[in-house]
Design a protein with these regions (language model features):
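Nucleotide-activated donor-binding/catalytic signature segment of Leloir-type glycosyltransferases, i.e.
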Residues: 242-267
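Conserved acidic donor-binding segment of nucleotide-sugar-dependent glycosyltransferases
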Residues: 319-320, 324-331, 340-346
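Short hydrophobic beta-strand element within catalytic cores of glycosyltransferases
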Residues: 304-307, 317
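Short alpha-helical donor nucleotide-sugar binding micro-motif in glycosyltransferases
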Residues: 266-267, 274-279
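Membrane-proximal helix-turn-helix segments that form the acceptor-binding/catalytic region
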Residues: 133-150
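Aromatic "clamp/platform" in nucleotide-sugar-dependent glycosyltransferases that forms part
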Residues: 287
Length: 384
């Protein structure tokens, strides 16, 4: 099958910034090639127009057109022309695009479009209790309604999306997956004496970073030796308009506690493994996700996790079986769960082993890729 992905992010040196969506597309693309499919990645919002190949994947970079009042529309038409040319050349049979801001809302293609829910702007505004821009909601709804197929990375994001957009369409749930060969634990790290808590991901309000400051203050009151390590890109804060979430966080830690906090900054996708391996526990106190790849990566490396108990979380972690789920606002309980795992090596290892097993059974990219292909085939059959 000849499959394309339309995205603004992908973790490649020649591409602009990439986060969770880009990582999930990369994992899927590489596995699809392994399974004998041809894959193209169309990257819009880039610094130049360029075509190149890597790992048997064809990349097409698109520089957005800038023209006051018409930039988005003209960029969409540029994307449309490129994809339709590739379809005419026999290089694409079906294309998958992410839901964010409805990039396909004004794109007419000569092949089926599948929209995958990773979380629209409307979805995240809903979870954050923030107003959404009317035009974004309109575009996202239009893109979803016009799609030939609809996938979702979790049941939760599908249900919420249907409700907020008043959609009657069904969504096929296929989770994000990871390459388990790249997440193989060094067993010597499971009994680590590093004694540190790891958060990795973007430093941003919606991921519960301002709750994490209070939680770690509580942890430090009991355990003065433990350290908190933060790895990820620093983002601006939408409510305070501050350009740095990290700067706000520093002011929220107790003074003596801050000495035990280290912010590493953003690291490459290849580097993150070593930080996860050496962590005693991983924490994810998020308020807004779709199905976070970071949680699955930590589970694959047999790490004990304390995560948010909101919505999507139960589709990844079974509370008190392969991790702990606690509401991020419940600082005391969250801190106590961290302390429990710091003090109980046996429980950490038990959680870690069961977490790995769940990833192998549900989130292996080999399984996930086959589920995607099965769905693409059904969409193509319907379009005949």
């Amino acid at each position: 099958m000849k499959i394309a992905f339309l995205t603004s992010e992908y973790p490649h040196p020649k591409a602009n910034f990439a986060a969770g969506i880009g990582t999930s597309i990369m994992n899927l693309s590489i596995e699809l090639v392994k399974q004998g499919h041809q894959v193209s990645v169309i990257l819009y919002g880039q610094d130049n127009d360029e075509t190149f190949s890597d790992n048997e994947i064809s990349f097409y970079k698109i520089k957005n057109i800038k023209f006051k009042g018409l930039s988005r529309y003209l960029t969409q038409k540029k994307i449309q022309q490129l994809i339709n040319n590739l379809v005419s050349d026999g290089k694409i049979e079906i294309i998958e695009a992410a839901d964010w801001t409805g990039i396909t809302s004004n794109i007419k293609l000569n092949c089926p479009i599948v929209i995958k829910l990773h979380g629209t702007d409307t979805y995240f505004c809903h979870l954050d209790n923030r107003p959404v821009k009317f035009i974004n909601k309109l575009r996202e709804k239009r893109a979803l309604k016009r799609a030939d197929g609809r996938l979702s990375v979790s049941s939760f994001v599908a249900e919420v999306t249907k409700k907020i957009f008043s959609l009657s369409n069904d969504f096929k749930v296929v989770p994000n997956g990871i390459n388990l060969e790249k997440f193989t634990s060094d067993y010597s790290s499971l009994n680590t004496n590093q004694n540190y808590i790891l958060y990795f991901g973007t430093l941003i309000r919606k991921k519960g970073l301002f709750e994490l400051t209070s939680i770690f203050n509580e942890v430090y009151e009991v355990n003065k030796e433990v350290k908190l390590l933060l790895v990820g890109r620093d983002a601006s804060d939408i409510l305070t308009k501050n350009k740095s979430t990290w700067e706000i966080m520093k002011s929220q830690f107790d003074k003596e506690v801050l000495r035990n906090v280290e912010y590493i900054g953003s690291v490459s996708y290849q580097e993150i493994n070593k930080y996860i391996q050496n962590a005693t526990v991983c924490v994810f106190p998020s308020f807004a996700e779709a199905l976070p790849v970071s949680w699955i990566e930590a589970m694959a490396l047999r790490k004990a996790i304390i995560a948010s108990n909101v919505g999507w979380a139960k589709e990844i972690i079974d509370d008190d079986v392969n991790g702990f789920l606690v509401h991020p606002k419940d600082h005391k309980t969250y801190a106590n769960k961290i302390l429990e795992l710091l003090d109980n090596c046996k429980k950490r290892n038990d959680f870690g082993e069961k977490a790995r097993k769940k990833v192998e059974e549900i989130f292996s990219i080999e399984i996930v890729a086959k589920q995607n292909v099965d769905y693409y085939k059904k969409v193509l059959e319907r379009k005949k």
